[in-house]
């Protein structure tokens, strides 16, 4: 049985430089939250909790699963759209 990291390594990404498909509208809003659920639930690890409480987002390697969109739905603090055609994740095994 192979590890999840080995399977994810098979996937490829075409990064759309300067045009991320996910954006945190107000980073200060995330600082005010006691729990930063996106930092725990994102399977690709795109969200990182900094020591000062801020949440940083790097969309390179995003699996486009929509988990963060569901988690942050109530706050409305996340802009999420599909990447432009030809960009984003390229799944090798389905």
From Swiss-Prot:
Entry superkingdom: Bacteria
Domain 4Fe-4S ferredoxin-type, first and last residues per copy: 20-52, 53-83
InterPro entries: 4Fe4S_Fe-S-bd, ETF-QO/FixX_C, Fd_FixX
UniProt GO molecular function: iron ion binding; iron-sulfur cluster binding
Presence of keyword Iron-sulfur: yes
Keywords for the protein's UniProt record, in alphabetical order: Electron transport, Iron, Iron-sulfur, Metal-binding, Nitrogen fixation, Repeat, Transport
Any one of the GO BP annotations: nitrogen fixation
Family: To ferredoxins from P.putida and C.tartarivorum, ferredoxin I from A.vinelandii, ferredoxin II from D.desulfuricans.
PANTHER family reported in the protein's UniProt record: FERREDOXIN-LIKE, FERREDOXIN-LIKE PROTEIN YDIT
Job of this protein: Could be a 3Fe-4S cluster-containing protein.
Identification of the protein by name: Ferredoxin-like protein
Organism: Azotobacter vinelandii
